[in-house]
């Protein structure tokens, strides 16, 4: 939830900024020259298609791609999980996309929450000015730096930062992207997690659909309107097929082709693409630490291991994302 009301924002600003909160689909991912940032799916009004006690089914005519986009959010009895499916029909060509939950860490003391993701091939800091001082924006991570451990990410000053501890580095705005390892029999899904005070939030995905995870680390580094240095302690933990948050035109240039990492997907007018994720919460004991693994524990259940060695089980149909 952004620290401003929609009515405080200039009419010229994108709708997305006016109501910045929660979780939203980005199709395509990133800014566009002649359309709103992150696409109509993140800015336009959705229609109610169907609903019920445990289902919300929404739809959207996308004027930019010509696609019919559906969002299905489902709850299941006895579970603390949201099953999210996006169906995209009628699009043609290569598009980037992503799911964009924004987690609010402002209730946590500095550095006390723990953020982690499933094993990744490599990580990168955005290779340019994600936060440009010309626009009164400031970043602290070393542009373009590659890393293999979120606890050791190069700073522009020469030291390393531990990105698993948050909130941290107030006054800065940074973007990193991790390329997930492919699925195995033992690890059929990829995951992201944030451990808070007594509970954790986690998401599950198919790495073939969402090959990368982006962390948008937003802790007061933007000083132009509507940010005004007050968007503190937030983090977008975003599952994407994109090149960072660059435009779809840049993603179509395959900037990571040499690494074998797709940044767009081919859509065909005569087919429907289904993109599925699960977001869930679970209680954790004190001193659980950052999540080090989330693996299947049989059908309809996962076991989550913390840095302390403690484990918790959560009822989640992980097969939904495969």
Describe the predicted segments one by one.
Residues 1-83, 94-322:
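Surface-exposed acidic/polar loop and edge beta-strand patches at domain peripheries
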Residues 86-91:
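Asparagine-centered strand-capping/turn motif at beta-strand->loop junctions
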